[in-house]
Regions:
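N-terminal alpha/beta PP-like core and its mobile active-site loop of ThDP/TPP-dependent enzymes
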Residues: 1-102
Length: 102
């Protein structure tokens, strides 16, 4: 049986779900996933200056395209900086998925 790393499996799953844009802010806990994302060209990576901007950009992307907004941030403050944007998307039933490091 062929083995595949969790990073490759994560990126493969995103592609299979039709994700073509990801809003991400790399950090220590997600650096391996970020490295895997940068090796491919099917998913465009938007790198903002702050996680709060990232989640609101993903929300706007979902609202304007009808596609799911996908976020990837590191643990700790990276994750907590998503809260307001997640609440906004949840309140308005906007399709938004956020992944954080552990």
């Amino acid at each position: 049986m062929k083995q595949i790393s969790g990073n490759k499996l994560f990126v493969k799953a995103l592609k299979e779900e039709g994700v073509d844009v990801l809003f991400g802010y790399p950090g220590a806990c997600t650096i391996d996933i970020s490295d895997e994302l940068y090796k491919q060209s099917d998913i465009d990576i938007i790198l903002p200056r702050h996680e709060q901007a990232l989640v609101h950009e993903a929300d706007a992307y979902a609202r304007t395209t009808g596609k799911v907004g996908v976020c990837l941030v590191t643990s700790g403050p990276g994750a907590t900086n998503l809260v307001t944007g997640l609440a906004t998307a949840n309140y308005d039933s906007v399709p938004l998925v956020c992944f954080t490091g552990q």
